[in-house]
C-alpha cells in the first residue's frame, strides 16, 4: 500500500551513485513531511481504533486521506462519520487540516464541518494545542474520542447544539438520531 515508502527506499539506494545524479528532481526531492508520513501512516495503521478506518484515495499522496469513525457507544452509536484530512507541507510544525464531511449535530463540530479539538490548534494558550511531537495517530484517536470521552458541552464550537443538550437532553438525542438517519448511514 505504501508506494511512497518504496519510492523512498529506492531513492535512498540511489544516493551516492551516478544514477542519483541523473534522476529527475521529482525522485530526488522528498519532503520532510513525506518522510515523516511514511513512518506515521505505518504506525497509525498498526494502532487504529477498532471504530476507525483510514482510506488513502491516492497511495502516492499520504498527505491526503479520509477517516471514517463509526462510534460503538454514546449518542453517536450507529452513525458513520467521514473526515477529510490534509497534511500541509509545513507538517509537523503545523497541524493537519481536518474537516468533517458528514453533517452532524455535535457541540464540538459545526454543521459545516469545522472541528473543535485542541490538538488541531496551531496555537493554544493552555498548551494543549499542536506540538511537533504529536502524530497522525494522535489526531485520529482525538477525532475518535470526540464521540465519547472528549465530547465537550462546556466549551462548544456549536453553541446551539450545546445549549440544546443543556435545555433538553432527550430532544438533543432525538435530533442526533435524526441526523444519523439522514446523513450518517
Curated annotation (Swiss-Prot):
Record PTM N-acetylmethionine, positions in chain: 1
Signal peptide: none
Highest taxon in the source lineage: Eukaryota
Key words of the record: Acetylation, ATP-binding, Nucleotide-binding, Transferase, Ubl conjugation pathway
Start and end residues of each UBC core domain: 32-185
The record's account of how the chain is modified after translation: The acetylation of Met-1 increases affinity for DCUN1D3 by about 2 orders of magnitude and is crucial for NEDD8 transfer to cullins.
Function: Accepts the ubiquitin-like protein NEDD8 from the UBA3-NAE1 E1 complex and catalyzes its covalent attachment to other proteins. Together with the E3 ubiquitin ligase RNF7/RBX2, specifically neddylates cullin-5 (CUL5). Does not neddylate CUL1, CUL2, CUL3, CUL4A or CUL4B. Mediates neddylation of the CUL9-RBX1 complex.
Family: Belongs to the ubiquitin-conjugating enzyme family. UBE2F subfamily.
Complexes and interactors: Interacts with UBA3 and RBX2. Interacts (N-terminally acetylated form) with (via DCUN1 domain) DCUN1D1, DCUN1D2, DCUN1D3, DCUN1D4 and DCUN1D5.
Protein name: NEDD8-conjugating enzyme UBE2F
Organism placement in taxonomy: Eukaryota, Metazoa, Chordata, Craniata, Vertebrata
The encoding gene: UBE2F
Amino acid at each position: 500500500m505504501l508506494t511512497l515508502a518504496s519510492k523512498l527506499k529506492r531513492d535512498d539506494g540511489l544516493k551516492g551513485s551516478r544514477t542519483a545524479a541523473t534522476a529527475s528532481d521529482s525522485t530526488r526531492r522528498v519532503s520532510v513531511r513525506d518522510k515523516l508520513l511514511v513512518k506515521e501512516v505505518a504506525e497509525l495503521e498498526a494502532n487504529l481504533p477498532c471504530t476507525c478506518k483510514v482510506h488513502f484515495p491516492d497511495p502516492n499522496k499520504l498527505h491526503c486521506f479520509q477517516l471514517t469513525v463509526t462510534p460503538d457507544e454514546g449518542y453517536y452509536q450507529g452513525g458513520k462519520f467521514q473526515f477529510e484530512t490534509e497534511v500541509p507541507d509545513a507538517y509537523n510544525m503545523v497541524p493537519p487540516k481536518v474537516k468533517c464531511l458528514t453533517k452532524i449535530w455535535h457541540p464540538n463540530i459545526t454543521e459545516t464541518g469545522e472541528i473543535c479539538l485542541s490538538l488541531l490548534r496551531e496555537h493554544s494558550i493552555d498548551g494543549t494545542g499542536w506540538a511537533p511531537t504529536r502524530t497522525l495517530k494522535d489526531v485520529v484517536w482525538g477525532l475518535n474520542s470526540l464521540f465519547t470521552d472528549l465530547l465537550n458541552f462546556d466549551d462548544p464550537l456549536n453553541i446551539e447544539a450545546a445549549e440544546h443538550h443543556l435545555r433538553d437532553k432527550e430532544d438533543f438525542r432525538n435530533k442526533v438520531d435524526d441526523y444519523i438517519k439522514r446523513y450518517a448511514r
